[in-house]
A protein has these predicted regions:
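Conserved glycine-rich cofactor-binding loop
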Residues: 40-41
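Substrate-binding pocket helix/loop in short-chain dehydrogenase/reductase
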Residues: 118-119, 126-128
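Active-site helix of classical SDR
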Residues: 142, 179
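C-terminal beta-strand-loop-alpha-helix "lid" module of Rossmann-like NAD(P)-dependent dehydrogenases
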Residues: 197-250
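Rossmann-fold cofactor-recognition segment
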Residues: 75-88
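Residue(s) in the substrate-gating loop at a strand-loop-helix junction
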Residues: 161
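Conserved NAD(P)H cofactor-binding loop of Rossmann-fold oxidoreductase domains
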Residues: 110-115
Length: 337
């Protein structure tokens, strides 16, 4: 990575530090209700337990009866049968939450899946299924609950990934990266459109934390391994398969628990000044490559055209964006009214 990108990346990483909300919910916020999809395991479950312990009320979306039963045992949690690909379950969840009379302050669109396949050997049915959960699921949930969120002038938090920024550097992750890039674009546009209603929208971009998405991905790969034959990426996919077999056999992730992600979700939901994006990684390397990728794409866009910026002009633009982010100035595109 060129020296300028490394230096700028280090500066940018510091800008992403969090100021978590206090450990206990403020009295005025206690019992505010939020909906978390995909709350049976991983980031969703961790966040549901943390928010409930701090006095918020959590509607926890889950698909399986045993998960619903387990979630209902947690104080300040009501489990909701909710498959984000099933419109009838979404409609029923809306009616249930409306009937509870608490209103709805926030949505955490957390449900997601990952399927590994190289782009030229992926199956269209897998791509459709992945987008049905990761993209259309976010769209369906947000659209269905938008009236309640507008009424409360609340929050929408979409769980994206560093994969929503990274692309082109990891074989077989293309479909997942496509879906998370879509979530990034959706979040940016939604934030713009909902601002006029007093609703704030954020994306969380977690790195590699312990979650159920990895084990689910591996179990799916193992189950389908006898039927999947690769021509161009056989060695790569065999290596992934062997790694998945070891992972499933051990049953334990070496990644840290998603406490930092839950803190970011809580900040986005309840802080007076939530950020639009929260890059949350367990180590500096994942932050560096994510910020570095953003700079790489910026420099590629700027390369050798009629309106390219010089290095000095790019740094000046970065300083201006930094000032806007800190609230020291407002954006001026230089366009006459």
């Amino acid at each position: 990575m060129p020296r300028i990108i490394k230096n700028l990346a280090l500066v940018a990483i510091f800008a992403l530090s969090l100021n978590p909300v206090p450990a206990l919910a403020r009295d005025a916020e206690a019992k505010k209700a939020v909906l978390i999809t995909g709350a049976s395991t991983g980031i969703g479950r961790f966040s549901a337990e943390q928010l409930a312990a701090e006095g918020y009320f959590v509607y926890a979306g889950a698909r399986k009866a045993r998960d619903i039963e387990a979630l209902n045992k947690i104080d300040n949690v009501m489990a909701v049968r909710l498959d984000v690909t099933a419109q009838e379950e979404i409609d029923a969840a809306v009616k249930l939450i409306e009937s509870e009379g608490r209103g709805l302050w926030g949505i955490v669109n957390n449900a997601g899946i990952n399927i590994l396949d190289p782009m030229i050997e992926a199956q269209e049915s897998d791509l459709k299924f992945l987008f049905d959960v990761n993209v259309y699921g976010v769209f369906r949930i947000t659209k269905a609950f938008a009236p309640m969120i507008i009424e409360s002038e609340g929050r929408i938090v979409n769980i994206s990934s560093i994969a929503g920024v990274l692309s082109g550097g990891l074989p077989a992750y293309g479909m997942y990266m496509m879906s998370k890039h879509a979530v990034e674009a959706y979040t940016d546009q939604l934030a713009f459109e909902m601002a006029g209603f007093g609703v704030k929208v954020s994306a969380i971009e977690p790195g590699n934390f312990s979650s159920a998405i990895g084990i689910s991905r591996c179990k799916r790969m193992i189950a389908n391994s006898d039927d999947r034959k690769y021509v161009y990426f056989a060695d790569v996919m065999q290596e992934y398969l062997e790694g998945c077999k070891e992972y499933v056999a051990e049953g334990v992730s070496s990644a840290p628990p998603p406490k930092l992600v839950a803190d970011a979700i809580e900040h986005a939901l309840f802080d007076d000044n939530p950020k639009e994006h929260y890059l949350v990684t367990p180590n500096p390397f994942e932050s560096m490559i994510t910020i570095g990728k953003s700079f790489e794409e910026l420099l590629h866009l700027n390369q050798d055209h009629e309106y390219s910026y010089t290095r000095e002009e790019l740094i000046e633009l970065m300083d201006e964006e930094w000032a806007i982010l800190r609230g020291e100035k407002t954006r001026d595109w230089g366009v006459d009214d």
